[in-house]
Structure formats: structure tokens, C-alpha cells
A protein has these predicted regions:
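Amphipathic alpha-helical "stalk" segments
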Residues: 1-128
């Protein structure tokens, strides 16, 4: 299921670097994202993760319903700043690479991060 396994390690590192650089610039420009209602962001992402987890085994990362949820996920991320294609892929890599983020997301479903990896990468490649 891991769509970004087809992407080169150099490109994946570029995605990680883009996330770090874009987030750092945004944090500086917005005084630590003070404009963002973090409680609402977390509630909105929770709604998406619960919807995905409810029937994850029957979903395809590329189906229209899933991609609509990922579009909503991206729109929530845009409340902080507008991530580039590479930074958005970098975000899902962070979910996979960071133990706390992996545990958090997989708390919704044991395969959530693996699924998000494919769904977000697909969304980024086709929509951003």
C-alpha cells in the first residue's frame, strides 16, 4: 500500500526538508501560528480520522470519498500555512517517522499511518 515507496529517497528527503523549512518560515511569520484555533483544528482532524478509521479496510486511498477527506485534511493544514506538494508529503512522512505521531494516528486504526501515507501522497501528486 505504500505509494511513496515508489518515490526516490532523495525526493522523500526533499519532502521532509520542505516541511521543516516551510513550517519554520510560517512559525516565524505568524508568531507561532497564533492565528490558529488549535482546539478546532484538532477537533476537525479528529472527525476526519474517525471517518477514515470507521471503514479503513474497505476504503481505497484513491477513491473519491477518501480523497475528499484528504482534501479536507489539507484544508485544515492550510489554516497554519499553505504547504507545498513536497511539504504535504513531508507531513505524512513525519506521521510515520515520529514515534508519538505514529502512535497518535495509529490509535484511530492500526494501519492509519500506512493508509494516510498512500492517500496523502496521491492527493499531493494529483491535486497540488
Amino acid at each position: 500500500m505504500s505509494e511513496n515507496n515508489a518515490l526516490s529517497p532523495i525526493y522523500l528527503q526533499t519532502c521532509r526538508d520542505s516541511l521543516a523549512q516551510e513550517q519554520a518560515a510560517s512559525l516565524t511569520a505568524t508568531n507561532g501560528w497564533e492565528h490558529v484555533d488549535r482546539n478546532q483544528v484538532h477537533a476537525d482532524w479528529d472527525e476526519i480520522y474517525r471517518a477514515l478509521a470507521q471503514d479503513l479496510e474497505r476504503r481505497s486511498p484513491d477513491d473519491a470519498d477518501t480523497q475528499e477527506l484528504i482534501r479536507r485534511h489539507y484544508e485544515i493544514a492550510c489554516r497554519f500555512y499553505t504547504p507545498s506538494r513536497e511539504a504535504y508529503i513531508g507531513m505524512v512522512l513525519f506521521y510515520r517517522d515520529n514515534e508519538d505521531m505514529l502512535a497518535f494516528h495509529n490509535g484511530y486504526h492500526e494501519n492509519m499511518v500506512e493508509f494516510l501515507n498512500v492517500a496523502i501522497t496521491s492527493y499531493a501528486q494529483h491535486q497540488l
